């Protein structure tokens, strides 16, 4: 049976690596982002689909899943990778920018999870994955908006895992504790004479972890996995 996957908040890093690894195994993959022009090369590479969606809009998220239904049916796995980022001194933050960041990270995660859960409950199971960050468990100075959103997303995953796990829907949260070596990042410019594996997470390695959790037997499901470079302090 062909695996069907929907990756929301798709880009060039860990989400692209997950799309590639799934496609290599014969999966059908749909990619969702606000700007799908940036996904053209990846879509063609994996033979997948690209759907435009603003995850903060109820109607757009509902339409995303309707389009996915029409293209390939109910996804077996949904990865929520979208995230908002705003930082700065608390006295200087733009409230509207903070609101948008929270909507994208937390509320968008809820909307996508709700649509995924409706379908997976009807089909008898599935997996809903979420990409977190160091800020999911630790609030740093001047990073209040990012931590607020990621804390909310983590709380969502814990609640969903307890509600949906007994109904055969695997909910997992991945804490990416460090910087990702996404294409286009120049490590030599940032940290000269540094081995990238010492300071950044490789997107392909993150994707391998997603796949490993996806393939877990339900007698031994992970709810949360944290990933970091081997020399990262924590």
List each model region and its residues:
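Catalytic loop of short-chain dehydrogenase/reductase
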Residues: 127-152, 157-158, 162-165
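The beta1-alpha1 cofactor-binding region of Rossmann-like NAD(H)/NADP(H)-dependent oxidoreductases
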Residues: 53-64, 95
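C-terminal helical subdomain
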Residues: 166-178, 189-234
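A short, exposed helix-loop element centered on a Lys and neighboring polar residues
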Residues: 113-114, 158
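Active-site loop of short-chain dehydrogenase/reductase
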Residues: 74-76, 89, 120-133, 166-169
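Conserved glycine-rich cofactor-binding loop
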Residues: 11-13
């Amino acid at each position: 049976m062909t695996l069907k996957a929907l990756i929301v908040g798709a880009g060039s890093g860990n989400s692209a690596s997950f799309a590639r690894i799934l496609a290599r195994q014969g999966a059908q993959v749909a990619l969702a982002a606000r700007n799908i022009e940036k996904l053209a090369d990846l879509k063609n590479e994996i033979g997948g689909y690209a759907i435009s969606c603003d995850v903060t809009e109820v109607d757009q998220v509902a339409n995303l899943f309707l389009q996915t239904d029409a293209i390939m049916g109910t996804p077996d796995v949904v990865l929520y990778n979208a995230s908002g980022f705003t930082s700065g001194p608390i006295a200087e933050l733009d409230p509207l920018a903070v609101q948008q960041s929270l909507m994208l990270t937390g509320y968008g995660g809820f909307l996508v999870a709700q649509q995924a859960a409706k379908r997976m409950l009807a089909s008898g199971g599935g997996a809903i994955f979420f990409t977190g960050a160091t800020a999911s468990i630790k609030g740093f100075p001047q990073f209040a908006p990012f931590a607020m959103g990621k804390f909310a997303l983590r709380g969502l995953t814990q609640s969903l895992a307890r509600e949906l796990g007994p109904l055969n829907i695997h909910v997992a949260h991945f804490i990416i504790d460090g910087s990702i070596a996404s294409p286009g990042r120049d490590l030599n410019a940032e940290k000269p004479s540094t081995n990238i594996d010492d300071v950044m997470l490789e997107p392909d390695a993150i994707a391998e972890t997603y796949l490993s959790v996806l393939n877990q037997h339900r007698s031994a499901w992970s709810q949360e996995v944290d990933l970091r470079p081997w020399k990262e302090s924590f």
